[in-house]
A protein has these predicted regions:
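Short polybasic amphipathic segments
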Residues: 44-51
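Negatively charged, low-complexity tracts enriched in Asp/Glu with abundant Ser/Thr
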Residues: 1-42, 54-90
Length: 90
């Protein structure tokens, strides 16, 4: 008997979807800073949002950082980021 194990992880499809949502959110007048770096050998995704428009010396309204990994906290943060971006499109 074969067993199947389902693993939740942050993958390239998720990152691509966040990038698409970010583009749509920016077209509605919000500022989104999206970046990917590789500080520990695992890609780190950073999404920072300022509502309405960019203003110098203003803090971000929302900030999300998560690794492209199978760690639960990264998966949860990624889903929170997606959810916030979707809410800004409503």
């Amino acid at each position: 008997m074969k067993k199947t194990i389902e693993i939740e992880y942050v993958g390239i499809e998720d990152v691509w979807q966040i990038l698409e949502y970010s583009r749509a959110v920016m077209s509605r007048g919000h500022y989104v800073n999206f970046s990917i770096s590789n500080p520990e050998g695992i890609p780190l995704v950073c999404v920072k949002i300022i509502l309405n428009k960019f203003i110098n010396n203003r803090n971000y309204d929302y900030s999300y950082e998560f690794y492209m990994s199978d760690k639960e906290n990264d998966f949860i943060t990624m889903n929170e980021c997606k959810s916030m971006l979707r809410n800004l499109l409503v």
